[in-house]
Structures are given as C-alpha cells and as structure tokens.
Amino acid sequence: MKKNVQIKGTKDGISIFLSDKASILELQQELTQLLADQKQNPYSGEKLEVQVQIGNRLFSEEEEREISTIIHKNSQMKISAFYSNVMSKDEAKKWKENDQIFSMATIIRSGQVVQVPGDFLLIGDVNPGGQIRSNGNVFVLGNIKGIIHAGFEGNENAVVAGKFLYPSQVRIAGKVYGFDSEDYKEVTETDLFSAFVNDAGEIVIDGIHKIRKIRPEISNFQGGR
C-alpha cells in the first residue's frame, strides 16, 4: 500500500510529500507516526529546513498550522514553505491581471501616478513629474519626460520602450537610470529606444529593435484592456 507521507531528499533539499488523496486527519496521524519512528525518519535529530509538498490540493491556514505543529513537536526540522501544484482563486486572479496589457490614451501630467498590475501601453506623453508604475513592461507611444517604473514588484525581465527625453528616468525593478543630459532635448521624432536590465544587472538603453532579440516572448503578447 502506498504511503500517504514520505520524507525524501531532492535536489532542492529535504522534502515531506503529503498525498493529496488522503484526508487531513490521515496525514496528521501518519506524519506523527513517521516522525516518531527514529528508524524511518533519519532526519529526526538534525536541524534542517524542509519543504512540504502537498500535490494537487490547497491547505487552509489552520491545516498548515496543524502540520507545522506536528513537525515541530516531533523533530528538529523547520518548514521553509508549503508547495502546491494548484493555485488559489486570489493567486489565479493576480496571475491573470499580471498577464494582461492595460492601455490608455492620455497625458500623464505632473503629480499623476498611474499604476497597473500587468503590461502597460500609453498612447500619449509622460510630462515631468508624472509617473507610470507597472508590474510588467511599459510601452509609450509619445514623449517620456517623467518616471517610468517597469517590473515594479521586482521583475528585472521587464522592459521599457518609448522616446526618452530629458529629464526622464527609467526604473526596472530596483534599478534606476536617469536621463540627466541636455543632449536628450534634441531627440528627433523617430528616436524610439528600449530600456532593459542586462546580464551585468545594469539598465541599458538601446534601439527599439533590441526588444525582440532580448525578450522574444514579447512579440507573442495578445489581448488588452
């Protein structure tokens, strides 16, 4: 008979696998018995971080606490995280929002902050003092003189595309690039650029054509809002 609870060493460290076919009560009982058996649990005396893999199910906060309590009471192991193959409704909603392209046709004026959860397309200008914050990529069909913050929640793979003019500033995740030179006042109408984080962890400004090369997945974007 297949065990509902197993402790295994993986490439990511030690994991406790809990069958998604068993009830929470069965898991609690088998986990307690397994951890209490020194012969079956060679890790009982070690202070290790473990991952708890719960398969195709979700645990409530209370169920996670109950499993955590059993592990802490019967071993020296510390849970680093619970991992599931499925996502909650809130996680699915956030994922869907982050996967969308939001668009506006307007001018972002001084003091204005526009924030979106996914990619953002602006048809218009960003004036000095105006700011765009996006969890994804930002594309501006207009003049950029304000602040563009792509990958707002830490996504360094995000890119920015548009016509950067003095005194614009580009931020990608935690990186910052400021256009503090008067030279950018003379940029022509055809000067569209891309900004991205390179392998050295620095923001690079290059031609618009570079986007497809460094982020080929962007050409597959569909949808809008």
UniProtKB/Swiss-Prot annotation:
**GO BP terms:** cell morphogenesis; division septum assembly; regulation of cell septum assembly
- Annotated InterPro entries: CAP/MinC_C, MinC, MinC_C_sf, MinC_N_1, Septum_form_inhib_MinC_C
SUPFAM superfamilies cross-referenced by the UniProt entry: Cell-division inhibitor MinC, C-terminal domain
**Record key words, sorted:** Cell cycle, Cell division, Septation
Q: Which NCBIfam families match?
A: PRK00513.1-3
What family does this chain come from, according to its entry? Answer: Belongs to the MinC family.
Task: Enumerate the HAMAP family for this protein.
Answer: MinC
Give the multimer and partner information: Interacts with MinD and FtsZ.
Name of the protein described by the UniProt record: Probable septum site-determining protein MinC
Q: Which organism is it from?
A: Listeria monocytogenes serotype 4a (strain HCC23)
